[in-house]
Amino acid sequence: SWTSGLLKYKSIPFVKLISELKEKYQVDIIIRNKRLTNPALVVSGTFSEDQSIGDILKVISNSLPFQWKKTDDTYIIK
């Protein structure tokens, strides 16, 4: 959750993180890679609310096997 300008999360499902990012940044994020929707797939990390959603996705994609692209106002995770 967002506290003092930071998004801190520990072992939360990737899909929950994406849901939080969608709400925080008011953007549409579509997960096309069905393996990433598995609730057992968890992520941990801390981000500043000053970071763009693109920066956050870039960092997460370094530790999880996915690629993403932005089309108009929609982020697509492949």
What are these regions (language model features)?
Residues 1-78:
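A residue-level detector for the "anchor" residue at the start of short, highly conserved motifs
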